[in-house]
């Protein structure tokens, strides 16, 4: 990861820091959009989706993992704050909102696809149907791409939205 390169830490150290419950609790107490959801069992990468993808200018000569994380979460705060009221009106957690956004982004070929995909998924959820997203199955399998086999759809994982209701 780029954070490992910039800080001089190993990728394992960065991931360990981002999975450390005491550190995550500090972040939960600092950022309005983080909650105990990221501490739930089965969450593969607690901060996934919360670290805003951007090119950051780092002026510190020896930045820490914590400083880099703060920069990314501060940027997430800036961008996500504009949707705060919308998220509340949907009766969704921020985690659910970001999960749905991630699925839509991966399912679509380009931004013009996103509203159509969102509409299909929202209709499925509102009708009590399974989400049935191939992307979530691939995520469960640790794969990228678009090809999903019948055997893949049998994967028993909470991320498999062909088997489990709601959002992963």
Descriptions of predicted regions:
Residues 1-6:
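Membrane-embedded segments
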Residues 7-9, 23-168:
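Bacterial extracytoplasmic/cell-wall-associated proteins, especially those involved in peptidoglycan
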Residues 9-20:
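Extended intrinsically disordered, low-complexity coil regions enriched in Ser, Thr, Gly, Ala
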């Amino acid at each position: 990861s780029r954070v490992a390169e910039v800080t001089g830490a190993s990728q394992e150290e960065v991931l360990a820091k981002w999975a450390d419950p005491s550190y995550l609790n500090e972040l939960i107490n600092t950022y309005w959009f983080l909650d105990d959801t990221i501490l739930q069992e089965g969450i593969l990468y607690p901060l996934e989706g919360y670290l805003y993808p951007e090119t950051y200018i780092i002026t510190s000569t020896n930045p820490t993992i914590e400083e880099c994380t703060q920069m990314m979460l501060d940027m997430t705060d800036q961008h996500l704050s504009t949707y705060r009221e919308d998220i509340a009106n949907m009766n969704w957690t921020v985690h659910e909102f970001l999960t749905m956004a991630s699925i839509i982004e991966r399912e679509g070929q380009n931004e013009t696809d996103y509203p159509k995909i969102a509409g299909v998924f929202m209709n499925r959820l509102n009708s009590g149907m399974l989400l049935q997203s191939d992307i979530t199955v691939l995520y469960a399998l640790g794969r990228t791409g678009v090809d999903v086999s019948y055997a893949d759809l049998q994967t028993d994982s909470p991320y498999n939205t062909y088997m489990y209701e709601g959002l992963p």
